[in-house]
């Protein structure tokens, strides 16, 4: 058996069950483990509880239980500059950002990784559901987690080969119920703690309130694509393409009771377009343009790829043809896709391997740009 005691792994511990079990498994495998709690947002939750304080208490309890040293590090400035400012800028531009993708790229696998290296880390580890496979030549491939419902490679798609070289994902071969069971068997303080949801590090805040604290809302007209006025919208930033709820209109407008959906935006005129039917024509597209396209291992500057893609988290893969040129790509769908949303990530897969991805700039319907921003 290999001696892991000389290999130092610094674990990002959030106070949740996944990162707790990550630290436990590495400790049991004999690694030299250090736990790090990242404080990236200074705030309280909707009930006035400072969630960071509560989470840190859980990290301390778990670290003490499994017998590892732990530290707290403050990345509030880095988070604000590299993630939250981007988040706000995207909403200002009428897009729907994915802060978790940027948070992984810039905080968990950049600021945190850099800090871990100052502690003499050989690797960092997190509680993400993903796997890494290493070739004989040292190339690292990122693979989906075996728990299909929990696989998080979509959010890790912007990681570089250099970041992956230094990363371990101990939960990648486990399913969530097994992780809970391991936590309970070890008597970990976080064994029964519910999973966190919401925006990366900010948590379960009222989203509308959070946005309105930083961006002034600009109410405007809500219209059908053929020009019927449907009332007022609260501000384009509060709506995403394909959204059903929160429109304040029912089937009473028009002859049928089919539900209404957001089918487009016009930022320049501050108009929100709505239409009836889940598969409304305006929601369907045949291709997209992406920028900030990045691959997890070395690829040519210009090439064409036949693969599958996801356009949102937990969506089944769809067959696509990808024409890559530098950090931009045209992605052509084998079948029309619904509600392709500017600002979201498009992520490419070859079987089990996550190849990388980019950020969606525009969707197209038979060569015509869809009015989504």
From Swiss-Prot:
Keywords: ATP-binding, Cytoplasm, Disulfide bond, Nucleotide-binding, RNA-binding, Transferase, tRNA processing, tRNA-binding. GO terms for molecular function: ATP binding; tRNA binding; tRNA-uridine 2-sulfurtransferase activity. Residues 98-100 are annotated as: Interaction with target base in tRNA. Residues 150-152, 312-313 are annotated as: Interaction with tRNA. ATP binds at residues 12-19, 38, 127. It is found in: Cytoplasm. GO terms for cellular component: cytoplasm. It catalyses: S-sulfanyl-L-cysteinyl-[protein] + uridine(34) in tRNA + AH2 + ATP = 2-thiouridine(34) in tRNA + L-cysteinyl-[protein] + A + AMP + diphosphate + H(+). Catalyzes the 2-thiolation of uridine at the wobble position (U34) of tRNA, leading to the formation of s(2)U34. This is tRNA-specific 2-thiouridylase MnmA. It comes from Streptococcus pneumoniae (strain Hungary19A-6).
């Amino acid at each position: 058996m290999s001696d892991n005691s000389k290999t130092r792994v610094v674990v990002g511990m959030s106070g949740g069950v996944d990162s707790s079990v990550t630290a436990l498994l590495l400790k049991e495998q004999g690694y030299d483990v250090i736990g790090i709690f990242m404080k990236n947002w200074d705030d309280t939750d909707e009930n006035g509880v400072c969630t960071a304080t509560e989470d840190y208490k859980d990290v301390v309890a778990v670290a003490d239980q499994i017998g590892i040293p732990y530290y707290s590090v403050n990345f509030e400035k880095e988070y604000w500059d590299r993630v939250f400012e981007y988040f706000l800028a995207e909403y200002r531009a009428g897009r729907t950002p994915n802060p978790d993708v940027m948070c992984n790229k810039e905080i968990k696998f950049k600021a945190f990784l850099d800090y871990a290296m100052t502690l003499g880390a050989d690797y960092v580890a997190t509680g993400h559901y993903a796997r890494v496979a290493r070739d004989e030549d040292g190339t690292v491939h990122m693979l989906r987690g075996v728990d299909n419902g929990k696989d998080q490679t979509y959010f890790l798609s912007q990681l570089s080969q250099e970041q992956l070289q230094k990363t371990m994902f101990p939960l990648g071969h486990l399913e969530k119920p097994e992780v809970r069971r391991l936590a309970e068997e070890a008597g970990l303080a976080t064994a029964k703690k519910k999973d966190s949801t919401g925006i990366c590090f900010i948590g379960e805040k009222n989203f509308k309130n959070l946005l309105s604290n930083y961006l002034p809302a600009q109410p405007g007209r809500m219209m059908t694509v053929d020009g019927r006025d449907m009332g007022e919208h609260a501000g384009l930033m509060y709506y995403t393409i394909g959204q059903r709820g929160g429109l304040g209109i029912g089937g009473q407008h028009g002859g049928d009771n089919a539900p209404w959906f957001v089918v487009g935006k016009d930022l320049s005129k501050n108009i929100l377009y709505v239409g009836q039917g889940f598969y409304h024509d305006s929601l369907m597209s045949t291709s997209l343009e992406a920028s900030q396209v990045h691959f997890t291992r070395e690829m040519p500057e210009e090439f064409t790829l036949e693969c599958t893609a996801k356009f949102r988290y937990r969506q089944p893969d769809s067959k696509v043809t990808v024409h890559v040129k530098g950090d931009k790509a045209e992605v052509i769908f084998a079948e029309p896709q619904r509600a392709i949303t500017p600002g979201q990530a498009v992520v490419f897969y070859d079987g089990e391997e996550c190849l990388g991805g980019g950020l969606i700039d525009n969707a197209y319907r038979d060569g015509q740009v869809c009015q989504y921003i």
